[in-house]
Swiss-Prot record:
Highest taxon in the source lineage: Eukaryota
Gene Ontology molecular function: any one: rRNA binding
Subcellular location, record wording: Plastid, Chloroplast
Gene from which this protein is expressed: rps11
Taxonomy of the source species: Eukaryota, Viridiplantae, Streptophyta, Coleochaetophyceae, Coleochaetales
Record text on subunit structure and interactions: Part of the 30S ribosomal subunit.
Record's keyword annotation contains Ribosomal protein: yes
Family: Belongs to the universal ribosomal protein uS11 family.
Chief site of localization: plastid
Keywords recorded for this protein, A-Z: Chloroplast, Plastid, Ribonucleoprotein, Ribosomal protein, RNA-binding, rRNA-binding
Organism for this UniProt entry: Chaetosphaeridium globosum (Charophycean green alga)
Identification of the protein by name: Small ribosomal subunit protein uS11c
One GO CC annotation: chloroplast
Example of a GO biological process term: translation
Length: 130
């Protein structure tokens, strides 16, 4: 006789997070916005690809704006009031995503650019000849 299966609770537990860190990773091909608490546990995330943009449209500023809006939506329910912003990468969507975060009403403690800069490391890709 089969055992009765236990009901598994798959719903996420929503906790109040007053302060957090917003990471914007803007590459040449995509923009990823990740929102964590102070310890580094992910609260919400979004990317241009996850918002439905494909191919070259993922690297546009509008795609970054949509990704930032989608990532910030759950924060209103969880009561985040203060945040720190870490921007990484040379992509086109970094300024647009930051603009949306500023308009959202969350107080920004600081905005830091954490783009890794090599001290003459690997050879960069060659220039395109079209």
């Amino acid at each position: 006789m089969p055992k009765p299966s236990k009901k598994i609770n798959l719903r996420k537990i929503k906790k109040k997070v007053p302060k957090g860190v917003i990471h914007i990773q803007a590459s040449f091909n995509n923009t990823i916005v990740t929102i964590t608490d102070v310890r580094g546990q992910v609260i919400s995330w979004s990317s241009a690809g996850a918002c439905g943009f494909k191919g070259a449209k993922k690297s546009t500023p509008f795609a970054a704006q949509t990704a930032a809006e989608k990532a910030l939506r759950p924060l209103i329910d969880q009561g985040m009031r203060q945040a720190e912003v870490m921007i990484s990468g040379p992509g086109r969507g970094r300024d647009t995503a930051l603009r949306i975060i500023r308009k959202s009403g969350i107080t920004l403690n600081f905005v830091r650019d954490v783009t890794p800069i090599p001290h003459n490391g690997c050879r960069p890709p060659s220039k395109r000849r079209v």
